[in-house]
Amino acid sequence: MVYGMMAGPVAVVSHTLSPDLNGQAVVLGRLFEGTPPLVRLSSDRFWRPQAIPGVIDERVATPWAIRKLRKLRFMEGTVFRMHVRHRARGIERALVQHRCSSVVACTGGDLVDVPAAIVAAERAGVPCVLHYFDDYRSQWKIPNPAWSTRWMERNGASIEAEVLSKASGVVVPNELLKSDLAERTSSPITIIRNPVQLDLYETLRGSLPAREYNPLRCWSIAYTGSIYEAQLDAVRNCARGLDVLRGRGIDVRLHLYTAQSEASLQAQGIPDSVHVHPTVKPLDASRVQCEADILLLPLAFVTRYPELIRTSAPGKLGEYLASGRPILVHAPTESFLSRFARDQRWGMVCDTLDESQIANCIERIVREPQLRAELSQGALAASRQFSEAVNREEYSRFLKETATFRKALRSSSLSA
C-alpha cells in the first residue's frame, strides 16, 4: 500500500482525550475540532467520551489479566511486549475497520501507546505520526508504578530509537525539543504550538472594566493547571516570596485553580495563605486568566526528570499569552520556557529558586506600569503564534505531507 493513496479518517491514540480537562486533551480537541471524520482511541479504561458528530470513539486499554502480569518484575521486557502486542491489535483493528488514512500516536502517561501505535500502523499499512507533547525518552525516566525504574532506565532510549526509526513524522510544541529530536531521527519534524482561540480572549479582554493599578491595593496572581513534581517547588517558592512582599507592605495573593486538593498541597509545603480553588473548565479558566493581575507560569527546579523540564511547553502557555496579562515565569534558566520568554519579551523571568528574587520580580511588576505594558504587549504579539486556526491548518497539512514520506517497513521487534 502506498501512503497518500488512501482517503479516510485520521486516528489518534492518547491516554487522555476530551472531555478530560488536562492540557493534552484540550490541545487535541482544538487541533481536531471541525475536522471530522476522526477516530479517537483511548488507552484509559475509565474514559467516558461524549458523543461528537463525525467522531468514532473506542477504548484500547489493556485488560486486567495482562495488567496483573506487571508484578512479575523479573520478566518486564516480555510483559511490556505483551502489552504492546495486545494494544496494537486493538489499534490495528480500528484502523482497518474504519479505513483510517493515518494514525497519530501521542506521548503521555502511558508508555505503551507509542510503540503499540507504530506496530499497528505497520500492520495496517498506514503512516504513523508521533505527537511529542513531551519528550518520550525523558518520560522513561519518570517513576511509573507500572514498571520498575531500573528496567525503564535500561530500555527507554532503545525503545524510543526504534519508534522514531519507523515514524513517518514527529510533531513537537517548541524549538528546543525539535532541535533535540533532530539529532535522534531523520523523520520530518514540525512545530505545532499548543493552540488557543484568540478571538475568545480578545472578547474577554474587551469585557473587563478598567483596572486600578495602586501598588497599595491587594493584587492577585493566578495559576490554572495541575501541580505535581514538575511545578511544585516553583509554586512553593512563589508563595514564600509573597510572604517577603508582605514584609515590604505589598499585598499579593496567590490563587491556584487545580485538581489537587488544598490538603495535598499543604502537605507538600504550600502555605495555607495560598487560595486553592477547584479546577475549572476551559472557558472559566480563560476568564480567570484575563481577570488576574499577574499570571504564574512555573516549572520545577529540582526534579527527577530535568530533561523533561528543559524541553517542556505547558499547554496553557498560549492561553496565558492571549490573556494579555503580565506573566511571571518561574523556571530554570536553560528551559525552553525561560528562553522563549526572554527572546520574545513577553514574561518577567525569575530563574533562581530564591524567595527574595521572586519577590523582587513581583514587586517590579506591581510598581512599574511601563513594565506591565511592555509585558502585555509582548504577550499579545507572541500569542499570534498559538492561533488555533493557523496551527490546526498546519497540523492537517503536516499529516497529509507525512502520508507521502514512506519509511522502509521492516519487522518490528517491539512486539516480537
Label each residue range with its predicted role.
Residues R89, R93, V119-R123, Y136, ...:
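Membrane-proximal helix-turn-helix segments that form the acceptor-binding/catalytic region
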Residues L176, P195:
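Carbohydrate-associated surface elements
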Residues M1-V60, L242-G247, A416:
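N-terminal subdomain of nucleotide-sugar transferases
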